[in-house]
Design a protein with these regions (language model features):
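Short, compact, well-ordered microdomains
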Residues: 66-102
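Charged, low-complexity intrinsically disordered segments
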Residues: 2-10, 17, 84-87, 97
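Compact soluble domain cores
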Residues: 7-72
Length: 102
């Protein structure tokens, strides 16, 4: 990795606070089984990469940053399993969960 790439990554600011970071048992199991580091997805979520959400949800997330509404991201951890990340409207907590746990 070159120095300019590192500078660009470090200069990207977080778009909103996460509050307390929590995960459901299903999310923890998925991350463990797939040997996936949750921080990668949390970082993407906090920097505005919403993953695999419909365009209307992505637009709602952008508005939510300004208006203080809930923010939802969805990421494929493997070919068939998704991880959702939801930051509460009041920014008190961010939860990692499976869609079926919602």
């Amino acid at each position: 990795m070159n120095h300019n790439t590192e500078l660009n990554r470090s200069s990207v600011r977080c778009l909103f606070p996460l509050g307390q970071l929590v995960a459901t048992p299903g999310a923890l199991d998925l991350l463990d089984r797939t040997e996936t580091n949750a921080q990668t997805f949390v970082r993407r979520h906090q920097h505005g990469d919403w993953g695999s959400v419909p365009s209307e949800d992505a637009e709602a997330n952008q508005r939510a940053i300004e208006t203080g509404c809930r923010i939802l991201s969805s990421y494929f951890v493997n070919d068939t399993e998704r991880l959702w990340i939801i930051t509460e409207a009041d920014r008190s907590a961010t939860t990692l969960l499976l869609p079926e746990e919602y």
